[in-house]
Amino acid sequence: MATVREKAVALDLCATYSPSQRPPGPNGSHRPFRATYIWSSIIQVLYTQVEVKKRRHHLKYHHDCFIGSEAVDVVFAHLVQHKYFGDMDIPRSKVVRVCQALMDCKVFEPIVTACMFGREKKRTVFEDSSCSLYRFLNSSNLLGVQVEKSNGRCTPQRPKHSSFQSASLQSPSLEDLWDNLSLTPADPTHINLTSNLPPKVVAEVWQEQTIRRLLQLVDLPLLDSLLEYTPVAPRIPNVKEEDHNLTSNYLDREILKAFSDAQADEWVSAAVDCLDFLPDHMVVDVSRNLPEQQAPDSKWKLLLFDTIGKHYSQNRAPLLRNQLFDIHTGIAELLVNGKTEPALEATQLCLKLLDSPSREEFRRLLYFMALAADPSEFRLNEETDNRMTVKRMFCRAIVNNKSLSKGKCDLLVLFILDHHKDVFKIPGSLHKMVSDKLVAIQQGTDPDRDTGYTFCQRVDKREFDSAAQNNTRTELCALLKTIYENNSLSPKEKKRLLGQFYKSHPETFIQYFGDRVSSVYT
């Protein structure tokens, strides 16, 4: 059987359907066979949607990298949103296998290396993790990864000259790949090919569906906090301020990074990454108080831990904002009742509502906390173990609300710490809900026709009015009974309250007391 690349060459598809080209229009003109088209669209969406930027991991800086879990999220959303496989539920594990196939076919490569017997060896298994980094093999063709000065993020631009040569699909054909994944492409007439919705609309749908899914998982007494939730806009730095920082504080931060590079310790690397979110004066203090190279590890590790802990122990807004306090309480209740799976999904949704800088800050802090809490690492406190020391130091930085008991705060923080590799993933249920809503908007149908889970029954107006009157009458009778049978009220006070009730609701009063009306109220 001919390989996919041979088929593409025979059909002259390399240039036409490379990631640099837009997918074919809804009319399906010049469309390659279905699996090749799906593969091409996956590669294109990876190039254009994953966040590619300089990242630090395993004591080194790596340029033009993206995170493994984010690649899975992007591919997952793309497959579900465009309904390439109809309404079939696609588990996240199969999307991971798709990413594994992309890596095997040299679309991208892992840059994180494992040291074995003094030699560095590339990982061969794709990891759905926020700690695994990858790089496109033809990243040189990703014209100018532009850096947004407002938040330092890098976004890849669509390559102008790129083909399948860098991603030569030489293993089984794409049809065989989908067969092995137990996924069958839908009929081409049902494949959603249009994606012309404005980014603002897509972002609003993501937030709306995230809130809707949270309401399905967590029982909330009030909805105001969710309905009025607006992410905090990232701060736009002043150009003059930025120039000043480059001259006065940039050197101190670079000294710290060079110091951590000289230490073969992931603990130190994670700590220095957290310093990016600390104010300049604290970073300057750390850089100018670094111990000598001959000093024991405990001295400078304790300096880093105390500095980070001091910053997050200050009176500042918690990373899990109090605006979503009811959600945090609901997650804690799920944990108390032993419902860990819905608690994990609710936590993932809650973190999805955070703005990008806050998510990145929380991710770095959580990774550092996980390393520092390891019992095999440097002992932070002689009296308590590392896990409890880390929890006590950073608990208020994550959740800080007086209405939530200390026990539930500790439970929630330790749960997030134990699942730090999973809490930033996007649940598959949310992908499905967003996909259905976007498809409905694109097709011009009512996007709220199918609301998913239903907690009430639709009734007509006559039935609603009747139920309202009956329920009101029942509650009024219960109130009247409470007043009449309350022995703590004086006869004068009781007579006054009964008189007010009779003047406001005479029919209910007469119905309740019947022939005794004259003796009760005269």
Swiss-Prot record:
InterPro entries: DEP_dom, WH-like_DNA-bd_sf, WH_DNA-bd_sf. GO terms for biological process: intracellular signal transduction. SMART domains: DEP (SM00049). Pfam families: DEP. Residues 46-138 form the DEP domain. Gene3D superfamilies: Winged helix-like DNA-binding domain superfamily/Winged helix DNA-binding domain (1.10.10.10). CDD domains: DEP_DEPDC4 (cd04446), RhoGAP_BRCC3-like (cd04405). Belongs to the DEPDC7 family. This is DEP domain-containing protein 7.
